[in-house]
Structures are given as C-alpha cells and as structure tokens.
C-alpha cells in the first residue's frame, strides 16, 4: 500500500514537472517556469510566461532558499512592481520596472528596516527629486529626518542641492549642473547661522571664499581662480592687473 502511494505521488510530481518549462513551436516560453541552482533543488526563480513575456508574479531566491526578489508583471503603463530583499528577509528596495529598467519612485531601506532614501528613476537612471534620510533618528526617536534633498538628471546631480543637520537646520545649499557644482554655495552651522559662502564654476572654486562669525562679521576672505587658491602675493598681482586693464575681478 505504501509502495502504491509512493508510486502515485511520483507520477503526480512527474506530471507537474512535465508541464513546466515548456516552449511552443516557435520556441517561445509558455506557462509555468522555474530554474534551480546547479546541483541543488533550491529555486533560482519561479513564474509564468506567455509568448515569451513574463506575466503575473515572479519570485527569485538566494542560494539558501530565502526570498531575494518579488516582481509583479502586467501593471498599467507596462510597469512591473518590484520588491528586493536582504538575505535576512528585510526589504532592501521597492519600486517599479518599465521594460526591465528602474522607473518612477523607489524606496530604499537599511538592513535593519529604516528608510534610507526615496529616489525617482527614468530609464534606469536617477531623474528628478531624491530624498536621503538619517538612520539614527528612526532608531532612537522613531523620527524621519532628511539628511539631503537633491535633484538628478540622467543619473547626475542637477539642480538645487540641500543638506541638513540632524536637528533639521540647513547645513549646506547650492546647485549642480550635470554633476558639477555651479554658482553660489552657502554653508551654515548647526544653529542655522550662515558661516561661509563660495562660488563654483564647473566644480572648481572660482571667486571669493568668505567665512563669517555668528554675528555676520567677515572672518576671512580667500580668492580662488579655477580651483587654485591665490597667495597674498598672487592676489596683489591679480588685483593690480585687473585695475591696470580696467577688468572687474571675479566676485
């Protein structure tokens, strides 16, 4: 009787396996598919295809069998909902794919569960606004505190940049153009008081770097040209040349 039961189970399982990993006459994947790691019964993935295109939910696994990723295909706009996992089961990231590339809003987490960033993607590149968070506040105070607020264009920093102290006060602000610092940048202390200003051209300091005390008095001024700091002698020569040629010095 036991032998008969075992035989029936074997036939049933064999029948299930025979229905998996099928292709049609044109070689296109159809129906349920799964793949295992070499020399192992542990699945790499399992899901379903229709005319060679993934449909429904696909699950992917680590070599130890823990869930690595879950992707739900067939959402409006040609998108797929994605959840990626650490090997301890915590969510690593969740967002969307479009044509197998990151798209729209993605949330990223620490292995201990804290939200670390919220980023926008287009064609697998960072595009638009992105927020980055302090981990400590979520652990100690259950508070979500922004560390940086930035913007991207085609994977490069582009637009307004702001960073913050843990207490929420502005720490630094300026602008990027395609990954390079440009224009006026300002720095503040943890009380929110301006303590420094500087200008950049194509990621190089170019102009006066000025530091202030908390009362707003100038502590120091240093001139940079194309990233090079001018010594007192070089500064004197530069200003004399500008005056002689009736040229306005850089600001």
Protein language model features and the residues they cover:
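Bacterial Sec-dependent N-terminal signal peptides
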Residues: 1-21
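Glycine/tyrosine- and acidic-biased, solvent-exposed loop/turn segments at the edges of beta-strands
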Residues: 16-251
């Amino acid at each position: 009787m036991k032998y008969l039961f075992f035989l029936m189970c074997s036939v049933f399982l064999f029948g299930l396996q025979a229905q998996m990993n099928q292709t049609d006459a044109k070689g296109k994947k159809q129906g349920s598919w799964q793949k295992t790691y070499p020399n192992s019964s542990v699945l790499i993935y399992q899901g379903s295809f229709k005319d060679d295109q993934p449909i429904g939910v696909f699950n992917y696994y680590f070599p130890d069998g823990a869930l690595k990723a879950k992707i739900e295909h067939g959402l409006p706009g040609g998108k797929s909902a994605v959840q990626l996992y650490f090997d301890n089961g915590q969510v690593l990231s969740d967002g969307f794919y479009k044509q197998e590339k990151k798209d729209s809003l993605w949330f990223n987490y620490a292995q201990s569960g804290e939200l670390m960033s919220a980023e926008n993607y287009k064609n697998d590149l960072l595009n638009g606004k992105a927020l980055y968070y302090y981990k400590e506040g979520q652990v100690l105070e259950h508070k979500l505190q922004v560390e940086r607020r930035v913007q991207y264009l085609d994977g490069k920093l582009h637009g307004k940049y702001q960073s913050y102290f843990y207490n929420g006060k502005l720490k630094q602000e300026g602008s990027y153009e395609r990954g390079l610092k440009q224009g006026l940048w300002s720095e503040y202390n943890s009380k929110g008081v301006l303590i420094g200003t500087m200008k950049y051209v194509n990621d190089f300091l170019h102009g006066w770097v000025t530091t202030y005390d908390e009362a707003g008095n100038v502590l120091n001024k240093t001139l940079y040209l194309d990233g090079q700091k001018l010594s007192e002698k070089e500064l004197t020569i530069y200003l004399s040349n500008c005056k002689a040629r009736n040229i306005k010095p850089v600001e």
